[in-house]
Amino acid sequence: MRLVQLSRHSIAFPSPEGALREPNGLLALGGDLSPARLLMAYQRGIFPWFSPGDPILWWSPDPRAVLWPEQFHLSRSMKRFHQRSPYRVTLNHAFGEVIEGCASDRDEGTWITSSIVRAYHQLHELGHAHSIEVWQENTLVGGMYGVAQGALFCGESMFSRAENASKTALLVFCQDFAHSGGKLIDCQVLNNHTASLGAVDIPRRDYLDYLSVLRGYRLPERFWVPRVLFPGG
């Protein structure tokens, strides 16, 4: 296994099965963040992650963290909180504010560079990247964003500036996504936060099998139209 240098003249990627074991999932470097290349990456189970000053790095880890939306773990305390929630949750109302929130709310630094922000703005404008916003009155207090692949949603990042705000974003999205035919959420790499919410590791090969099937599914035509998700009308 060796790290592949991508060409700027082709959006082709090597097979994810050729990714390095250490660091886990590193597959390629270089290329660019054009919409066509990003979409090709997601279609193949690959995503970009790199620090400021580094070349663009492309990853497909094994195992892969996923969340089945019906299996979101709703703790008793979160259930009580949500029943009296002070929040309003919307879809695709403030993509730019959400990705900037994810970029800025990282004490240890961020991988969401200005080039990443620009690239995902382009994907959003093309109808492929989407945001979930959590509002307290008129203030954005949390949210998440990611890339749609049919009935699979590739979660990229989330942030929280108030109690349970990011949990609320994921909970409400899971409920709405599942209700409309969504099947799986890609969480990329398992961490304590996503594990506490029900995410689990599966073999990369299984993830790629799910992706190949689910990306061909179609959600209702107006699913990604900007709207209020919570509270219901």
Swiss-Prot record:
Top-level taxon in the UniProt lineage: Bacteria
EC nos: 2.3.2.6
Keyword field: Acyltransferase, Cytoplasm, Transferase
Catalytic activity: N-terminal L-lysyl-[protein] + L-leucyl-tRNA(Leu) = N-terminal L-leucyl-L-lysyl-[protein] + tRNA(Leu) + H(+); N-terminal L-arginyl-[protein] + L-leucyl-tRNA(Leu) = N-terminal L-leucyl-L-arginyl-[protein] + tRNA(Leu) + H(+); L-phenylalanyl-tRNA(Phe) + an N-terminal L-alpha-aminoacyl-[protein] = an N-terminal L-phenylalanyl-L-alpha-aminoacyl-[protein] + tRNA(Phe)
Stored InterPro entries: Acyl_CoA_acyltransferase (IPR016181), Leu/Phe-tRNA_Trfase (IPR004616), Leu/Phe-tRNA_Trfase_C (IPR042203), Leu/Phe-tRNA_Trfase_N (IPR042221)
Keyword presence, Acyltransferase: yes
GO cellular component: cytoplasm
Function: Functions in the N-end rule pathway of protein degradation where it conjugates Leu, Phe and, less efficiently, Met from aminoacyl-tRNAs to the N-termini of proteins containing an N-terminal arginine or lysine.
Protein name: Leucyl/phenylalanyl-tRNA--protein transferase
Annotated organism of origin: Klebsiella pneumoniae subsp. pneumoniae (strain ATCC 700721 / MGH 78578)
Lineage, opening ranks: Bacteria, Pseudomonadati, Pseudomonadota, Gammaproteobacteria, Enterobacterales
Name of the gene: aat
